Amino acid sequence: MTKVVVGLSGGVDSAVAAFLLKKQGYLVEAVFMRNWDSNLNFDIQGNPTLNDICPQELDYKDALKVSEQLGIKLHRVDFIEEYWQKVFMSFIKAFENNLTPNPDILCNNEIKFRAFIEYVTTKLAPRYIAMGHYANIIYETFSEQKLFPQLACAVDQNKDQTYFLSQLATKQLQNILFPLGNLTKQEVRQIALENNLINATKKDSTGICFIGERNFFQFLSNYLPAQKGDIKTLDGTFLAHHKGVMYYTIGQRKNLGLGDFSSQKPWFVVGKHLQTNTLYVEQGNTHPYLYSDKALISDIVWRGKKTNLHLQAKMRYRQPNQDVILTWIDQNTLEIYYPQTIKAVTPGQICAFYNNNICCGAGVIKEVYFQGTKRLYT
């Protein structure tokens, strides 16, 4: 029998993935990974579960019950140190530099598809490694008739997770299986219910990857002390004080503390200036400064050929893909122009590129422009 190891989180998606693989005749083993320790990592303020049983341990109990139901062996591994160093400290450093990072993408790059794969390959030696992500892998032929894995969108467009996987290198996709890629979330739930899986009705995990739901300002204040500064309009009019520019993101509407200046149009963050610790706001969700037509993308990870310069881009999860024109600056940097202006393109976020349903690669949004002028987003 062909051996496959599944990353089993305790949630319904990975449970159904393991069930389907066993049904298909694979020799299935599972691994549960724990990557966060609230006490060790000073996760105090903003943590609603601090005085409860550790959520990760509850997830482990669910994973254990699922493995017993399915008759598969469950292993456990901790990547708490690796997550702290490779994911969380990069996350905090980005905020310190006035950027808005995506920890889920960092987590996939450094933990799920690097540390986890290295551990499983070394310790368990399977033919394949499977995950419960909503994505697909197809193989294309390039030079020397070799087959290369390409990341493709899931059938369920609402749950598609290729954006979060977009910065994976080609080698990280080798021998990976995504059993849920051709199923909808509703179908996954139905499979779990029909087969009496213990977590069939368990809620999906939300919040920061492997950390969970948090009061974001309070959570960040555990690691980044508040730095009070001015909130101004673009013409320099002072309105109020903010808690620290790193706590806000471009396009943000809520929690600005501008109720005394309310009118028919709500306020939005349109700029952040780190050197002066100034937060810029304007009224109306169609304010011109919220929009851009060009961006510089760095730290590119690309899979396959670079010949197509007319692609689609996604600059935040579940955003509709936008037509873009690419200009390569060097191997790791490109400039994109989008004929239709896009709202709240934010430095530090990931820009993922698509050729129809194939996710070609991604990079970090570095700078944002409109009609040749750089936006004051950093």
UniProtKB/Swiss-Prot annotation:
Catalytic residues (positions): C107 (nucleophile), C209 (cysteine persulfide intermediate)
Region (Interaction with target base in tRNA): 102-104
Listed transmembrane segments: none
Region (Interaction with tRNA) residue spans: 159-161, 316-317
One Pfam family it belongs to: tRNA_Me_trans_C
Binding annotation for ATP: G7, L8, S9, G10, G11, V12, D13, S14, M33, G132
GO CC annotation: cytoplasm
Site (Interaction with tRNA): H133, Q349
Biological process according to GO: tRNA wobble position uridine thiolation
Disulfide bonds: C107-C209
Residue ranges that the Swiss-Prot or TrEMBL entry lists as coiled coil: none
Chain's role: Catalyzes the 2-thiolation of uridine at the wobble position (U34) of tRNA, leading to the formation of s(2)U34.
Family: Belongs to the MnmA/TRMU family.
Name this protein carries in UniProt: tRNA-specific 2-thiouridylase MnmA
